[in-house]
Amino acid sequence: MKIVEKLYLCDDNALRLMDKQLRYNDFSNFLSEYFPHKVQKISLNAGFTCPNRDGVKGYGGCTYCNNQTFNPAYCRTEKSVTQQLEEGKQFFERKYPQMKYLAYFQAYTNTYGELERLKSMYEEALSVDGVVGLVIGTRPDCMPDSLLDYLEELNKRTFLLVEYGIESTDDEVLRRINRGHSFACSAEAVERTAMRGIKSGGHIIIGLPGEAYTHGTPDERKEALNVMCDRLSALPLTTLKLHQLQLIRGTRMAHEYEQNPEECKRYTADEDIDVVIDCVERV
């Protein structure tokens, strides 16, 4: 569903929320605490892969994944980080000439590589005119201490948000979608990141096959959803992104759905909104 595609929950900023009559802190409010001007994320594809794609932890990647479905046209690995950012800027500058930007390392696992290569790409992005910070999307099992050492230093001189793909708090669901890590791994990564003073975000997909809150009686579904929210609330997350499940043609999950449609709950728009509201109220 596209009604609520992404929702961020952030701490503090209560007065601003009251002024806007919001019951949660959205991402734009969160950014306004750090920047006096409008800020836009620009997605990047820096040519990384994932350990559940290259054989280290498995093959094929996550069963729902097809990065090309959300990457902008300019995100091509044959283009440098700088070129991708400049092309992304051109799109927004037509409407907002004073816009500033966050370089969003989004595609695949953006901490999965040699430390010097990672540092070079991050620093290249920060050198582009108008870029005022980084958002780095990654997996919880791809954050070595050596990289955290560097990110801790980087965090002292620029805006930095590390966004972890948690996806589910249920280990059986994580196994089913071929994530290759546990929820405990996610919790540990978030805690280690927060201990360094680095802002961390969590990404959750609502409605994955096998989630307990997608089946059973209404009371059973609500209780299962509360369990997930309580697990997330216990983490020292700065932001939380809730994303609806999308079945993309050609993915393994789409094939599984074609074979056994009853195994995957397809929410209506109203049901999707109700689940998000329940999550917001709980966390």
Language-model features, listed with the residues they occupy:
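Generic structural signal for well-ordered alpha-helices
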Residues: 82-89, 118-123, 148-152, 186-190, ...
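Catalytic cores of alpha/beta
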Residues: 210-232
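Acidic (Asp/Glu)-rich catalytic clusters
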Residues: 93, 122-129, 151-159, 191-195
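C-terminal accessory regions of radical SAM enzymes
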Residues: 263-283
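Core AdoMet radical
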Residues: 68-88, 92-115, 130-143, 159-186, ...
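N-terminal [4Fe-4S]-dependent radical SAM core
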Residues: 1-63, 67-102
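Flexible glycine/acidic-rich beta-alpha junction loops that bind and position SAM and/or redox cofactors
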Residues: 206-217, 238-267
